[in-house]
């Protein structure tokens, strides 16, 4: 334990917390352009074809981001909005693409958790 005199001479260092999404540069979301849209397979116990896109952000970073929901309309040169949030079974995927923003369409025929997938409220007559 340091003495008072040692603390006067050199104060204690603040512990800096590392950002989990450095490419966003402290912004809630960033705009970017898709450079490649493809599928990849998850880590060991899981099996699927997960849809991901390589995106060049306005901050200058090129990141891999996950496309959530069933079906998408993204292709190369699509303008997308990227938020933070990793995908646990895809190594290196630390970002999500926001559905229903910019060039990304919302999920069609989605009735529950619509706000997460950019789906509009269905008409009253088309229920069930």
From Swiss-Prot:
Keywords, alphabetical:
Methylation, Ribonucleoprotein, Ribosomal protein, RNA-binding, rRNA-binding, tRNA-binding
Sorted alphabetically, the Gene Ontology cellular component annotations on this record are: small ribosomal subunit
Which Pfam families does the annotation name? Answer: Ribosom_S12_S23
Q: Which GO terms describe its molecular function?
A: rRNA binding; structural constituent of ribosome; tRNA binding
Where does the record place the modification 3-methylthioaspartic acid? Answer: 89
Q: Which CDD domains match?
A: Ribosomal_S12
BP GO terms, sorted: translation
Tell me the InterPro entries matching this sequence: NA-bd_OB-fold (IPR012340), Ribosomal_uS12 (IPR006032), Ribosomal_uS12_bac (IPR005679)
- HAMAP family reported in the protein's UniProt record: Ribosomal_uS12_B
Q: Which family does it belong to?
A: Belongs to the universal ribosomal protein uS12 family.
Chain's role: With S4 and S5 plays an important role in translational accuracy.
Q: NCBIfam families per the record?
A: rpsL_bact (TIGR00981)
Q: Assembly and partners?
A: Part of the 30S ribosomal subunit. Contacts proteins S8 and S17. May interact with IF1 in the 30S initiation complex.
Its protein name is Small ribosomal subunit protein uS12
What's the source species for this entry?
Answer: Campylobacter jejuni subsp. jejuni serotype O:6 (strain 81116 / NCTC 11828)
Per the record, the gene is rpsL
């Amino acid at each position: 334990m340091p003495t008072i005199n040692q603390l006067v001479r050199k104060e204690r260092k603040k512990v800096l917390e590392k950002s989990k999404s450095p490419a966003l540069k402290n912004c809630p979301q960033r705009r970017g352009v898709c450079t490649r849209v493809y599928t990849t397979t998850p880590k060991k116990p899981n099996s699927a074809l997960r849809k991901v896109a390589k995106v060049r952000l306005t901050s200058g970073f090129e990141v891999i981001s996950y496309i959530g929901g069933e079906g998408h309309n993204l292709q190369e040169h699509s303008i997308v909005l990227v938020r933070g949030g990793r995908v646990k079974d895809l190594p290196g995927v630390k970002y999500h693409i926001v559905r229903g923003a910019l060039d990304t369409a919302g999920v069609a025929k989605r009735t529950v958790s619509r706000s997460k997938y950019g789906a509009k409220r269905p008409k009253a007559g088309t229920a069930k």
